[in-house]
A protein has these predicted regions:
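N-terminal intrinsically disordered/low-complexity leader segments
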Residues: 1-8
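Secondary-structure edge/capping motif, primarily at the C-terminal ends of alpha-helices
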Residues: 99-102, 127-130, 157-161
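An amphipathic alpha-helix adjacent to DNA-recognition modules
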Residues: 9-12, 16-20, 24, 29-33, ...
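Amphipathic alpha-helical packing segments from all-alpha helical-bundle domains
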Residues: 87, 107-133, 137-151
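Short acidic-glycine-tyrosine-enriched beta hairpin
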Residues: 164
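Short amphipathic alpha-helical interface segments enriched in basic and hydrophobic/aromatic residues
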Residues: 20-24, 70, 93, 124, ...
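Amphipathic alpha-helical segments that line or abut small-molecule/effector binding pockets
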Residues: 78-97, 144, 148, 152
Length: 164
């Protein structure tokens, strides 16, 4: 991954912020590059220097969230649900604008589904070591139940529980 200079980082940040504001109001397939650029106060050539279209911009935001999620899981004991929820909430706090639009209040979010899929292999591998007598079916079922439960705690309870 190439290092971006400050101007490019700023431009991408403004485009992402503008896109997320529009995404609060309407679905991605109804957002135009012209609208994003008008809100960002940038011209379309600048937009196209960074992204091919609004879907590419959304994919970039989603990938940043996936990367942040992956980093938040690196140092967490996957058996410690409290630590896992705290790590996820920390990631949401650090990426609040994108998470509020793409994840929170949206249990069918594609980002959320990608996060669940990302954590599955490592979680099951960890549990396989911790629970050597568990069958693959048991481990799969355990992951399904825990990931769906965690997903709902995060999506439905973020604002409620983060205040505590």
């Amino acid at each position: 991954m190439e290092k971006l200079d400050a101007r490019k980082r700023y431009t991408q940040m403004v485009l992402k912020q503008s896109f997320l504001k529009l995404l609060k109001e309407k679905p991605v397939n109804r957002i135009t590059v012209k609208e994003v650029c008008a809100l960002a106060q940038l011209n379309r050539a600048t937009f196209y220097a960074h992204y091919s279209d609004c879907f590419a911009l959304m994919e970039s935001i989603e990938n940043e969230l996936i990367d942040a999620f992956e980093k938040s899981l690196r140092y967490v004991n996957l058996f410690d649900v409290t630590a896992l929820i705290e790590a996820i909430y920390d990631m949401v706090d650090q990426n609040q604008a994108a998470c509020r639009v793409l994840i929170l209040g949206n249990t069918s979010s594609t980002v959320l589904m990608r996060m669940i899929a990302l954590a599955k292999e490592d979680s099951i591998a960890y549990w396989r070591k911790e629970l050597p007598n568990a069958s693959e079916t048991d481990l799969e079922m355990m992951y399904t139940h825990l990931s769906n439960g965690l997903m709902h705690v995060v999506v439905e309870g973020y604002d409620k529980y983060s205040e505590d």
